[in-house]
A protein has these predicted regions:
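Extreme N-terminal signal-anchor transmembrane helix of membrane signaling/transducer proteins, especially
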Residues: 1-28
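Long, amphipathic alpha-helical coupling/dimerization segments that relay conformational signals between
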Residues: 6, 34-37, 150-152
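Juxtamembrane membrane-water interface segments immediately C-terminal to a transmembrane helix
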Residues: 25-50
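Extracytoplasmic ligand-binding sensor domains of the Cache superfamily
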Residues: 48-54, 58-153
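The canonical Cys-X-X-Cys-His
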Residues: 150-166
Length: 166
């Protein structure tokens, strides 16, 4: 093998190493940026949900409207499950959200296994306000799961206390 061939092979190998390193670094950077963007989006949706929930709930209570079959759908606890289902009609980026419970009155609001695990985690870590982790469902599809507790406050028990009082 001539010196010229050896130099070209060495340069080719060096170029391959540099390109591989650049690809690996770029991939890690892009993955981190995508994760940061997904976390930002999750926090934005959460903030909007909580602000909407608080304003509508307060408005409903202050309005003096009776809570009955005709008006209960206006309360966030009832409307948010419908809003979360309709959200996909307006946004195709894969974000889904819901409000769930480990003891729901409405079976449609039952927490899944990942959400139940998050609830147990928040009970063990009550000072934490959010949690993000990667999960893989039973179909092998991966997601970024953002969870944040909605703690029960005294005014919540007006509707969410004893069934006979609701």
């Amino acid at each position: 093998m001539t010196l010229k061939t050896k130099i070209w092979l060495l340069l080719g190998a060096l170029m391959g190493v540099v390109l591989t390193a650049d690809l690996a670094v770029s991939y890690r950077k892009m993955t981190g940026e995508l994760r940061s963007e997904a976390e930002y989006d999750a926090k934005t949706v959460y903030g909007f949900m909580m602000a909407t929930r608080r304003i509508y709930q307060k408005q409903f209570v202050e309005s003096g409207l009776p809570i009955n079959e005709s008006t209960v759908g206006f309360l966030p606890a009832h409307s948010f499950s419908r809003i979360s289902r309709d959200f996909a009609n307006w946004n195709q980026n894969g974000i889904v959200f819901n409000t769930v419970s480990d003891l729901p009155r409405n079976p449609g609001n039952q927490a899944d296994r990942f959400e139940l695990e998050a609830m147990a985690w928040f009970r063990a870590n009550p000072k934490d306000t959010q949690r993000m982790r990667n999960i893989v469902d039973d179909k092998g599809v991966g997601y970024l799961l953002y969870t944040a507790p909605v703690w029960i406050e005294p005014y919540c028990l007006k509707c969410h206390g004893a069934i006979e009082d609701a």
